[in-house]
Curated annotation (Swiss-Prot):
Pfam families: EF-hand_1, EF-hand_7. Ca(2+) 2 binds at D111, D113, S115, E122. This protein has four functional calcium-binding sites; potential sites II and VI have lost affinity for calcium. Interacts with RANBP9. Coiled coil: none annotated. GO terms for biological process: cochlea development; learning or memory; locomotory behavior; long-term memory; metanephric collecting duct development; metanephric connecting tubule development; metanephric distal convoluted tubule development; metanephric part of ureteric bud development. It comes from Rattus norvegicus (Rat). Residues 2-7 are annotated as: Interaction with RANBP9. The keyword Calcium applies. This is Calbindin. Ca(2+) 1 binds at D24, D26, S28, Y30, E35. The modification N-acetylalanine is found at A2. The keyword DNA-binding does not apply.
Amino acid sequence: MAESHLQSSLITASQFFEIWLHFDADGSGYLEGKELQNLIQELLQARKKAGLELSPEMKTFVDQYGQRDDGKIGIVELAHVLPTEENFLLLFRCQQLKSCEEFMKTWRKYDTDHSGFIETEELKNFLKDLLEKANKTVDDTKLAEYTDLMLKLFDSNNDGKLELTEMARLLPVQENFLLKFQGIKMCGKEFNKAFELYDQDGNGYIDENELDALLKDLCEKNKQELDINNISTYKKNIMALSDGGKLYRTDLALILSAGDN
């Protein structure tokens, strides 16, 4: 099925989902190693079989990743390579998803109750707003289809809602700083202890200076994952979740807490 979709001159949103599912064999949300090489090989075979030239985007993609063992792409990168239907592709090209800081601000707008999740109706409004900002409108049926596909693409634990880290897969891999923090998340007890330690004045939130101290210590302890030279970027992106410069426990937990275990 993936081969026939790769032969198409225009790939629908549903076909794109099937292609992604086919190649993301381990369900990690990214294509890397053998998965990525399989995609490149099947793409080349499918286009040749259909008598179609590689598009400029495909050529660039093959040149960039064809000979690399360490390549890694997300859904966003694949959406830019394949000839995906215009309105669906716009969801991956909007300005709000060009940088992690803008993404965090957008998340704050929709996660109004600080629950750490965006549910189906909120996601639908989020996608609708993105399309409207690109001067595109879709009917309710198509919007529902896009919402359903986004949940299928990003909802890795199948709970019908998206966590921040799941939603962040809308960002290009190079922009997704949250990936850096995946390996250093703390259990709930450790996180609460750390929050109370760095909330030095005990006012229930962490300000920019307190966050700076926390990040410096994290960088020192996790040199393989975090680069101390990037502290200002980490801080700017995390503070985009704050409420007027106040970073509450639930907000910081989205970045640093792995849950209650």
